[in-house]
Amino acid sequence: VPNDNPVTSPAPLRHLLAEVAMARLAEAQALNEEALRQALSQGRPAKCKARILAVVSSKGGVGKTTLCAALASTLHLKGGQTLAIDLDPQNAMQYHLGVQPDVAGMGSASLTGESWSDLLLPGSAESLLLPYGALTEEERHTLERYMANDRHWLARQLARMTLDENDVVILDTPPGRTLYLEQALDVADQIVVVTNTDAASFLTLDQMDSLLATPNMRAPSSEYSYVVNQFDASREFSRDMHEVLKRRLGGKLLGVVSMDHALGEALAYGHNPLLGAGSSPACQDLLNLSEQLKSRLEF
């Protein structure tokens, strides 16, 4: 007589499989712990050949990830590839670069010892993306403990990727001072601080300047600059704040990107506005910014 009841795995088998998976993860973490101990005894690794750009901000909501994705789409050196690495647990860069959401990413690879190069995903405009990936709270704490215990953790990860001198790596970091930011500052050749023409952003400038001036916080040869994002020229207060920022930042002000709601709408529709025939003022600002950074990276 046919059995119409669905076949289910016995509970003990599910438990055994879960135990095997947990044991595998524990073994990988133990290997990582041993690798960390060995790495710490070796000091700082050799500098990665690729040009590294860190995009940072003191506060959220300034359009940092959107700007980071725009640079990943437009900033290319001849003969090289451009990689965006999402160091932000929000894991939002994948949506900006038109990449299908993936569970695997930088986080899980770092815990299991996988090569970051094997997890790169193709994004828009021939860019490549290493997403942050999906982690449990416990896994994220473990990852951040690795970073806290090894000042040059990110430098070691990048060194394993065997990148070329014409490659560009763009790092998207969480807002504020975090372990991810400190790791990014340790390896970056160029640091772009994204700010807005609002009072809250202005009040964080001293905090960021102080951090960037902290001894040994960033690579000795690195340079940093500011970009004013989402500038609304139709508002008098925004125009006044723009003038205040120009005076405050002086030569550290690299560029200004106009407010353009179409950039956010493009994310909703899954296309890259920088690749279209018609170019808005904001798109042109982003292209100009990309060219300026390209000239700085071509050393």
Please report, for each region that a protein language model flagged, where it lies by residue.
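C-terminal lobe/tail of nucleotide-utilizing enzymes
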Residues: 2-44, 217-299
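Conserved catalytic-core segment of NTP-binding enzymes
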Residues: 78, 164, 168-258
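Cytosolic-facing regulatory segments adjacent to core modules
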Residues: 116, 129-178
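Phosphate-binding loop that captures ATP/GTP phosphates
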Residues: 78-82, 87-132, 254
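Walker A/P-loop phosphate-binding motif and the immediately C-terminal alpha-helix
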Residues: 48-90
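Active-site signature of alpha/beta-hydrolase-fold catalytic machinery across serine-
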Residues: 70, 74, 96, 183
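Short, hinge-like loop/turn segments at secondary-structure boundaries
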Residues: 99-104, 211-212, 242-244, 271-274
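Conserved nucleotide-binding/hydrolysis micro-motifs of P-loop NTPases
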Residues: 89-90, 125, 134-137, 198-199, ...
